[in-house]
Regions:
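N-terminal cap/lid segment of alpha/beta-hydrolase-fold proteins
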Residues: 34-67
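Alpha/beta-hydrolase-fold enzymes
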Residues: 18-19, 152-157, 166-311
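Short alpha-helix in the alpha/beta-hydrolase fold that links the catalytic acid
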Residues: 328, 342-352
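Alpha/beta-hydrolase active-site loop
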Residues: 128-152
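Short, surface-exposed "cap/lid" segments of acyl-processing enzymes
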Residues: 54, 63-123
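Cleavable N-terminal signal peptides of Sec/SRP-targeted secreted and luminal proteins
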Residues: 1-18, 123
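Catalytic active-site module of serine/aspartate enzymes centered on a nucleophile-bearing elbow/loop
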Residues: 357-394
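Short beta-strand/loop motif that positions the catalytic acidic residue
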Residues: 326, 332-334, 338
Length: 394
């Protein structure tokens, strides 16, 4: 989720349009250079690309790994990520493992990331309005459009959903804001669920507690787009994080794992360099800020401040998002070593949701946030649980 926040200060020093010498490509393993279609093709999946248009005009990329159309599964990525995160482990990745088991796999890219930086009439480079969104808009427009598109394409009435990190947040919001979609979901498997952020670990807690300052800094720089895949910040990431040994020690061991939790043995150096070729994939300042607000208050709509809240919502405070309305079957899977989606917070979520059919705390105790999508042994430790849930609630 908020993986790159510890280095947000670096972004303050970088103009989004700045040119940085980009000489690190040679250090990127092949899987770090391939895009989603390239990776899917390399690992033997029959792949399609679909463009879907939301009701508010965003053009989203939806990838399809062709399988049995009576068994559709939608994968929702986390913040600053893209659909790539579900295929980076190649033959042992979740996307490839699902399609090998016959599932019809669809992968959404929400507005603003590397694949969905398009709109019918707004220019992401010049129109601030393009970036006026958070996970609420992902729910109301992006995921709902993807669900409808997939169901129409397959002829099915329901589908399964697997979300990771913020990909779970937007699914809860969907069930609340568009309750009719609860009936379109067979089961929502929530990996590293993010809804409450009251018990994040020290480094992440400091970030959440200072989200107001981070937001103000980005506002001063007029940075409505954050950590774009095509920005100087991404080039800086490549130069710094993809260098052999130095990049691994600096970025993964020095920044990412202290924030997310996890065991370095699960994200080895060679894979780390490939993964960093796909990350960060971009988001909006507002989305980053809204997620940070989850640690400061209840699960609610975006907080603009009392004056603007009054104009937008008619109240001084933003309306709460009522989790009691999320009636879709939900499985919660949390890692004991996760510093972002903590066991204490996910237990609170379990108690708030009305239809939790399975709650799992993953071992070992070092199982961190990124283990869910990037872990070397996740296909062995967690995937069998997912497959069992999909089969049970088919």
């Amino acid at each position: 989720m908020i993986i790159y926040l510890p280095v947000i200060c670096l972004v303050f020093a970088i103009n989004a349009g700045a040119k940085l010498k980009h000489d690190s490509v040679a250090n990127i393993p092949e899987d770090g250079r391939l895009d989603f279609v390239g990776l899917a093709t390399k690992y033997g999946a029959n792949t399609e690309e679909h463009d879907i248009v939301t009701d508010d005009g965003y053009v989203l990329k939806l990838f399809h790994l062709v399988g049995d159309r009576t068994r559709p599964v939608l994968l929702n990525h986390g913040i600053l990520q893209s659909s790539d995160t579900f295929i980076l482990r190649g033959n042992t990745s979740l996307a490839i493992q699902l399609v090998k088991r016959g599932y019809d796999v669809w992968l959404l890219n929400v507005r603003g990331n590397r694949y969905s930086r398009r709109h019918l009439y707004l220019n992401p480079n010049t129109d601030e309005e393009f970036w006026d969104y958070s996970f609420v808009e992902f729910a109301k427009f992006d995921i709902s459009a993807a669900v409808d598109y997939i169901l129409q394409a397959t002829g099915e009435k329901r589908l399964s959903v697997i979300g990771f990190s913020e990909g779970t947040t937007s699914m809860y919001a969907l069930g609340i804001l568009k309750p009719e979609y609860n009936d379109k979901v067979k089961i929502h498997v929530s990996l590293a669920p993010v809804c409450y952020m009251y018990h994040t670990r020290p480094i992440t807690l400091n970030i959440v507690q200072n989200i107001e300052h981070i937001n103000r800094g980005l506002l001063l720089l007029n940075s409505n787009e954050v950590l774009s895949f095509y920005s100087a910040a991404k080039k800086l990431s490549d130069v710094s994080c993809i260098r052999e040994k130095v990049g691994y020690d600096l970025c993964l061991l020095g920044i990412i794992l202290p924030v997310t939790g996890g065991d370095k043995r699960e994200i080895e150096e060679e894979f780390s360099r490939a993964a960093m070729g796909h990350f960060p994939a971009g988001t909006s300042r507002k989305n980053l800020y809204h997620l940070g607000q989850l640690g400061l208050r209840k699960f609610s709509h975006f907080d603009y401040g009392s004056m603007q809240n009054k104009a937008v919502y008619g109240t001084d405070t933003p309306p709460k998002l009522n989790l009691a309305k999320v009636t879709m079957k939900t499985a919660l899977i949390v890692g004991r070593g996760d510093r972002i989606s903590t066991v204490k917070d996910v237990r609170l979520l379990r108690d708030a949701l009305p239809n939790v059919v399975k709650y799992i705390e993953l071992q070992p105790d070092s199982f961190g946030h990124l283990n869910f999508v990037w872990g070397r042994n996740t296909h062995r430790l967690m995937f069998p649980m997912i497959f069992k849930l999909l089969e049970k609630y088919k």
